[in-house]
Each structure stands twice: as C-alpha cells, then as structure tokens.
Amino acid sequence: MALIQHGSVSGTSAVRLSFSSSVSPPSSSPPLSRVSLNFQSEKKSCYRRMICRAMVQDSVQGIPSVYAREMERLSAKESLILAFNDAGGFEALVTGKITDMQKIDVNERITNLERLNPTPRPTTSPYLEGRWSFEWFGVNTPGSLAVRVMFERFPSTLVSLSNMEIFIKDNNTKATANIKLLNSIENKITLSSKLTIEGPLRMKEEYLEGLLESPTVIEEAVPDQLRGLLGQATTTLQQLPEPIKDTLANGLRIPLGGTYQRFFMISYLDDEILIVRDTAGVPEVLTRVETSSPMSSSSVVENLEYNS
C-alpha cells in the first residue's frame, strides 16, 4: 500500500511484486510429497494475490464512489430548496396558496434527499442542536395547527405569520412563531418542550409551557384610523394595578405539564437541513438559521461509508 500512495508503481504491480518474489522456482525433479506442498503454497499465494488485488481495487474505486454520492446529496439539497422557492416559500405555505402539483413536487424531492441522509444516528448528533427555521410542514404538525387556529379567527388581511423557528439545546426546545397584526403590532408565541431519545432515529417531544409575549407596537405603521384607539388602550394599561401590568409585561404563561406529546423520526440531518416525520409520515423541513462549522471531508466519507 505504501507503493500505491507514493505513486511509484500501480496497485496490481505492487501486489504481484510483493508475493511473486516470495515463491522460489521448484527444483528439476522434486519428490511427490514436495510437489504437493509447493502446490498448496502456490494455491495459498494465489488466494493472497486475489484478496490483496481486491483490496487495492476497493480502495481505489471506493473514494470516487463516496464523493459521487456526496455530489448527488448536494444536488438533491439544491433541488429541494429550489422547489420551496418555486412554490412560493413559507408565506405561500401558511396562506394555503400552494397547489397540489407543487406539494407533490416538494414531497418527491424530500424523499430523494432523505435516502442520502449522511448522519446514521441523528438523535445524538451535535448537528441537531442550534436554531432552525420551518420551511415546510404538513397538515397535522404543530406548526400547521397553530396556523390553522390563527387564520380561523383572523382573516389573512389582518394577521400574518412571518416565520416560525425552533431552538434546540440539551434535549430542550423552544419554538417561536412571530405574528403581526394589522402590519403594526408584533407578537410572539413561544412553546417550550422536552425531547427524549427513543432510538437512533426516533424521539419523543413533551410540551411543557406556552408563552404569549407582550405585543410590540410599531407606532409609525399604525393606520391613522386606529391611532386614537391605540392611545386609549395605552392609557388604560397604565391605570391597571402593578401585578397585572407586570403579568402583561412578562407575557401570559400557560403551563402544559407534559399533557401533550408526540413522537417523530429524524429522516435527514446535516449542518444545513433537518427533516422529521411524525407518526403519520408527514414531513417537516427546517433549515439552519445559525451557521455552524461545515462537515469535514473525513466525516462525510465516514458517514457515507457507514450507510453504503
């Protein structure tokens, strides 16, 4: 193998030289028993040549195949992101403006990327931690339920959901939805939960607490017809007792105590994209908000060889 690395001779020549030189030519008239022993020795030597030649071929052919798979994975990631953009992105998803053709196209590309998952044990991978932004979610996921409740009570002209993020650290999560009313009042809804590892791919999520933060008013964006109402509301809030004002300032907390839980499976994870599926198989796709250090080439090779 040293000869192969320095490029002095080919892999096949190195194997032939190393083993052919060890076999001495037979004598002119050897005894029958000696011929039999030499035959066994040559047979074993032949086996050794075949094994070593196969090892050399695997080492030479394995590296291109690993990186070809890596290039295929990167292409599948780019294809999925393009499908999100073509479908209208997060805004089109939450407002229900995505067509069935766009949905099936996105789901097909999700499946193509999942089969190239480079992380064999995502539930214990350090890549799982960090801040993630929701790009895609299905009908029965927590994200879609929150959107459905919100838009059932308020028309889309009055309320909008700008983005949804989740922060994962030490098996604890904090999901945040940023809501804007009348394009002038911003509010955040936060849902805290605890994650439990159930296996290499499977996790359990228990919801602990919900928090409705105090709204922030963008005064310059308030319509003229509502400025009077805003002034009256501000005056009323200032006249409230201090305990109530403190409660409103700190937000309204809703203890859940682990009453609600769900199971999900991580079907894909790298340093940029996270894909999970619930018990019904519905996918959620998230992209990393905070950039992390890229995967080294050695870790890519290790993970892909594990899956191959």
Swiss-Prot record:
User: What family, per the record?
Assistant: Belongs to the PAP/fibrillin family.
Q: Which domain of life is it from?
A: Eukaryota
The protein depicted here goes by the name Probable plastid-lipid-associated protein 9, chloroplastic
Q: Cite the entry's keywords alphabetically.
A: Chloroplast, Plastid, Transit peptide
Gene of this entry: PAP9
Q: Where does the sequence pass through the membrane?
A: none
Identify the PANTHER family for this entry.
PLASTID-LIPID-ASSOCIATED PROTEIN 4, CHLOROPLASTIC-RELATED (PTHR31906)
Q: Where is the transit peptide?
A: 1-55
State if Cell cycle is listed as a keyword.
no
The UniProt entry's GO CC annotations, sorted and at most eight, read: chloroplast; chloroplast thylakoid membrane; cytosol; plastoglobule; thylakoid; thylakoid lumen
The record's subcellular location field reads: Plastid, Chloroplast, Plastoglobule
Q: Mind telling me which InterPro entries this protein's record contains?
A: PAP (IPR039633), PAP/fibrillin_dom (IPR006843)
Asked if Coiled coil is a keyword of the record, the answer is no
Give the species this sequence originates from: Arabidopsis thaliana
